[in-house]
Amino acid sequence: MMLFFSSLSDWLPGVSVFRYITFRTIAAMLTSGLIVFLFGPSIIISLKLRQGKGQPIRADGPQTHFKKAGTPTMGGLMILSGIVVSAFLWCNLSNIYFWVSLFVMLSFGMIGFYDDYLKVTKQTEKGFSGKARLSLEFLVAAIAAFVFLQVGSPGLALPFVKDYFINLSWFFIPFSAFVIVATGNAVNLTDGLDGLAIVPVMVAALSFALIAYLSGNINFADYLQIHYVSGTGELAVLLGAVVGAGLGFLWFNAPPAAIFMGDTGSLALGGLLGSVAVATKHEIVLALIGGLFALEGFSVVIQVGYFKLTKKRAFLMAPIHHHFEKKGWTESQVVIRFWIISIVLALIGLSTLKLR
């Protein structure tokens, strides 16, 4: 919306700054953060009154988690509200990549909201049917992938390799849908401790904001010899809103958390990250930058598969952050060490932009 005013620079001095992606990214970050910070307390009070007992606590989880009983969930509503308002203010509303990514984020958010709703109202750890939830997620992701295919190319870029792309043809759609769904659920699995998921999400969002900006600028893309995708620079503004909203949410989610993100937020943010990775042709780099999410997801897959084969557990508890809690790490140790891992992995992922 604010981009419109840049066309009035002849009459309004200074508004030409609105045309710059870098300025709008910072503005989106500040706007979303302020919205979440200001309206967060009232949202938390409202959710607490409506939810009563809050999110159910896993009976087989660490004993320290039982003191979290009564903490409201669906904190993703705070995050998504801040992102959407800020995005509509600062993003280019004619950009197709913006709309598709927003579609994925909000659709995944609605799926997560329904899951949270069932858990809270029925006071059970199991919400939405797993098969039904995945089916809806794949439908949303496939629609997004189809649109990306229409406006872009079906190529898969490889990190560390110059000017080489694998033509996926129509396999691009199922592959991209898998990336989006897998990322959404991996972030969802990571969201198990106070503050654990939101910081790695912000780290990944910042990293992909840079990637989106560079990929959408033909001069930078040519210099770095990365795939140029016209229009993806606008995703940096959207991701800036994610970072700002994440900072605002962390104020309330810092231990001891006053609110949990819930599936409403984790599915939505993960889906958005996957969507941006597909749009910018950095799907493989996402596995590095979002390596912590991949680790959490794989730990569950390994735990389930190993148990089916041997009737034993590979980890004391999955996802893997609970394994370390069972090993004796305090919650704050797990959270901060996982934050460090996410930052290191993001730096490694960003290094692929130059190491070719």
Curated annotation (Swiss-Prot):
Its EC number is 2.7.8.13. The chain crosses the membrane at residues 25-45, 70-90, 93-113, 138-158, 164-184, 195-215, 235-255, 258-278, 284-304, 333-353. NCBIfam families: mraY (TIGR00445). This is Phospho-N-acetylmuramoyl-pentapeptide-transferase. It is a multi-pass membrane protein. The lineage of its organism: Bacteria, Pseudomonadati, Pseudomonadota, Alphaproteobacteria, Hyphomicrobiales. Belongs to the glycosyltransferase 4 family. MraY subfamily. It comes from the Bacteria. It comes from Bartonella henselae (strain ATCC 49882 / DSM 28221 / CCUG 30454 / Houston 1) (Rochalimaea henselae).
